[in-house]
Amino acid sequence: MEARDVILRPVVTESSMAAMDDKKYTFDVDVRANKTQVRYAIEEIFGVNVKNVNIMNVRGKLKRQGRYAGYTKKRRKAIVTLTADSKEIKIFED
């Protein structure tokens, strides 16, 4: 799996934006990706040093449209912690 296939998009929420001050970045990743693949993908794409990777699976939510019910897609989130001497990731480039 290529590095661009592993990392899908950054997660932009209030808590993930607050965690960026501690050099913790949250990304949606491919559901088949493991911690090692996420680490190498982040280091290759952004050119930073990764200290730690935490991964969690998010179940799909039940959504209803009238009498029809279905689920949203399940997804996988990775919280990547950078080393202290690493540069910051510019998600929103000015």
Curated annotation (Swiss-Prot):
GO terms for cellular component: ribonucleoprotein complex; ribosome. InterPro entries: Nucleotide-bd_a/b_plait_sf, Ribosomal_uL23-like, Ribosomal_uL23/eL15/eS24_sf, Ribosomal_uL23_CS. This is Large ribosomal subunit protein uL23. The keyword Ribosomal protein applies. Gene3D superfamilies: 3.30.70.330. Part of the 50S ribosomal subunit. Contacts protein L29, and trigger factor when it is bound to the ribosome. One of its GO terms (biological process) is translation. One of the early assembly proteins it binds 23S rRNA. One of the proteins that surrounds the polypeptide exit tunnel on the outside of the ribosome. Forms the main docking site for trigger factor binding to the ribosome. Keywords: Ribonucleoprotein, Ribosomal protein, RNA-binding, rRNA-binding. Belongs to the universal ribosomal protein uL23 family. It comes from Latilactobacillus sakei subsp. sakei (strain 23K). Pfam families: Ribosomal_L23. GO terms for molecular function: rRNA binding; structural constituent of ribosome.
